[in-house]
């Protein structure tokens, strides 16, 4: 069975392959978006992570005729009513500018005390079949937001985020101070992808 991932991100593709192999589903072939001819990526104009994930998964399934998985993720700060949320990549108005995005959210949270700095990374994955079946799963990585960035690994809001697991262990590292392997083992995307395993397994006898 082939499963299209609506992305060319090697990390996302590899993470799903590893999860499927560990679940005994090594016969499932993970196909990148680059393998699909004449594909026009849809506009992600949804109001929620689920909206955007479904937009991408529906487009992929319709165009390719394959079961398609897509994800949308971002940084959600409780004090900011869950924002930056779906606007995480362009929070400062410049798409993909991590430095200015971080500066803006830090400024917005400047006077917020420690006890009100709860934040989470959120990943929503959608799986859509060519027949129109749709499944939505969500992974959350809970923690808190710092008052200044720390760490050189990762990207996005990683330097501002201390996972709850780090606080529980007494180490207090940001996700930008963790190794990629440590981060992937407990991250929001991994948690979401794990929930797709039984769904994919259920379709493996039909496609």
From Swiss-Prot:
Originating species: Corynebacterium diphtheriae (strain ATCC 700971 / NCTC 13129 / Biotype gravis)
UniProt family annotation: Belongs to the HAM1 NTPase family.
Catalytic residues (positions): 72
A Gene Ontology cellular-component term: cytosol
Keywords: Hydrolase, Magnesium, Metal-binding, Nucleotide metabolism, Nucleotide-binding
EC annotation from Swiss-Prot or TrEMBL: 3.6.1.66
Protein's recorded name: dITP/XTP pyrophosphatase
Co-factor requirement: Mg(2+)
Cofactor info, note text: Binds 1 Mg(2+) ion per subunit.
Residues that hold substrate according to the record: 7-12, 73, 155-158, 183, 188-189
The keyword Nucleotide-binding is annotated on this UniProt entry: yes
Highest classification ranks of the organism: Bacteria, Bacillati, Actinomycetota, Actinomycetes, Mycobacteriales
Catalytic activity reported: XTP + H2O = XMP + diphosphate + H(+); dITP + H2O = dIMP + diphosphate + H(+); ITP + H2O = IMP + diphosphate + H(+)
Chain residues that bind Mg(2+): 72
Protein task: Pyrophosphatase that catalyzes the hydrolysis of nucleoside triphosphates to their monophosphate derivatives, with a high preference for the non-canonical purine nucleotides XTP (xanthosine triphosphate), dITP (deoxyinosine triphosphate) and ITP. Seems to function as a house-cleaning enzyme that removes non-canonical purine nucleotides from the nucleotide pool, thus preventing their incorporation into DNA/RNA and avoiding chromosomal lesions.
GO biological process terms held by the UniProt record: nucleotide metabolic process; purine nucleoside triphosphate catabolic process
């Amino acid at each position: 069975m082939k499963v299209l991932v609506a992305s060319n991100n090697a990390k996302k593709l590899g993470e799903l392959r590893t999860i499927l192999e560990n679940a005994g589903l090594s016969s499932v072939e993970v196909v990148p978006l680059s393998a699909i001819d004449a594909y026009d990526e849809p506009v992600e104009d949804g109001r929620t992570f689920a909206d955007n994930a479904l937009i991408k998964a529906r487009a992929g399934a319709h165009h390719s005729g394959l079961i398609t998985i897509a994800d949308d993720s971002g940084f959600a700060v409780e004090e900011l009513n869950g924002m930056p949320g779906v606007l995480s990549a362009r929070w400062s108005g410049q798409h993909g500018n991590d430095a200015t995005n971080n500066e803006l959210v830090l400024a917005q949270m400047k006077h917020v005390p420690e006890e009100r700095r709860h934040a989470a990374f959120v990943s929503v994955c959608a799986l859509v079949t060519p027949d129109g079946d749709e499944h939505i799963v969500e992974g959350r990585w809970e923690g808190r937001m710092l008052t200044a960035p720390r760490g050189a690994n990762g990207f996005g809001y990683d330097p501002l985020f201390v996972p709850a697991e780090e606080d529980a262990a007494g180490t207090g590292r940001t996700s930008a101070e963790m190794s990629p392997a440590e981060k992937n083992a407990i991250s929001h995307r991994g948690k979401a992808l794990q929930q797709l395993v039984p769904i994919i397994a259920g379709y493996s006898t039909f496609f």
